[in-house]
Amino acid sequence: MAHLASSFASYETFLRGADAFWSVDLGAMNNSGVTGDALLSVNTEEDGTRYLNISISAAGLTPDVRHAQHVHGTFDAEGNPSDARMPVIADDADQDGFVEVLEGLAAYGDILLPLTDGDGVLPMTRSDGTMNFIQSYELGDASNFFSPVSGNDYTAADLMPVENREIVLHVQSVGSGFGEGTGGEINGSQDGYVGLLPVAAGEIEGTNRAQALDILED
């Protein structure tokens, strides 16, 4: 059951046999207009192997480009998991009108799990700016858990409790001139595609099978 095709029919099959369920209501960041939701579920195979399956559906994204997306998480001073949150405009330290990726770090934390397909490829949006993504990750495979930004390695234990974690989507087209004289990815020199800029985020919340199936159907 773990190695499912990347389709909503296959994910429905996974949900019906899953042990735990979570959902995410993705909210727009940086005036992107992005909307969407995500589902997460865990299934335990007969041999004890556990898989995390994640589906993301989003609209309002920059069309026809690959979008980075991750599960992020924060830790306290002792290294214990803390509650990540969606950044707000008050996190815009350089006051250029954009909460850039590093400015949001205190809110959502480091990348714990990059959300790519089985070949490590980022998902591509359609020409209408929509995206659907489904992928399974073996929780016992530590190679799944790392940050391409900080270089830190993580494990599935760092992902827990899942309710403390955040999903963040990136990539926006931003015209030249915005943020001129400031640092970060919006510094006035950009002209179009900005791969790092966060465009949507949402806190992971617990749900149940019936609600998860309803979200999938919608």
Where is each model-derived feature located?
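N-terminal leader/targeting pre-sequences
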Residues: 1-216
